[in-house]
Design a protein with these regions (language model features):
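Short, mixed-charge low-complexity intrinsically disordered segments
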Residues: 2, 9, 20-29, 64, ...
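Broad hydrophobic/π-residue packing in well-ordered secondary structure
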Residues: 33-35, 57, 79
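Generic hydrophobic, helix-prone segments enriched in Leu/Val/Ile
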Residues: 11-12, 26, 37, 70
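Negatively charged, low-complexity tracts enriched in Asp/Glu with abundant Ser/Thr
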Residues: 1-21, 46-49, 58, 84
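Short aromatic-glycine-(Arg/Gly/Cys) micro-motifs in beta-strand/loop hairpins
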Residues: 24-53
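A short, charged, amphipathic alpha-helix used as a generic interaction element across diverse proteins
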Residues: 47, 58-76
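Short, charged/polar low-complexity linear motifs in solvent-exposed/disordered segments
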Residues: 41-42, 54-56, 69, 82-84
């Protein structure tokens, strides 16, 4: 569990894979007065995850829209996206 999820309420997690390899994990956490999307990105040829962000939004609706657009883009690029 991420540090943010320990103090907020985790809304959802989306895990994208391509050719069986993890590409990214997106996690939305609601803090009541804001919502944060955390990202772990797994670059090709690297064992280590990169953690851009976090991305802070006014509410869960905005955070969900952001993740929805990211998921649609990942699917367009040939990734399989799963809810966790």
């Amino acid at each position: 569990m991420s540090p943010a999820a320990q103090t907020g309420r985790e809304l959802f997690v989306r895990h994208a894979k391509k050719d069986g390899r993890s590409v990214t994990v997106l996690r939305a956490v609601d803090f009541g007065d804001s919502c944060v999307v955390e990202a772990e990105v797994f670059p090709a040829g690297s064992q280590d995850a990169v953690r851009p962000g976090p991305y802070t939004f006014a509410d869960a609706v905005q955070a969900t829209q952001f993740v929805t657009e990211a998921v649609e883009s990942l699917m367009y690029l040939g990734c399989d996206v799963f809810a966790e």
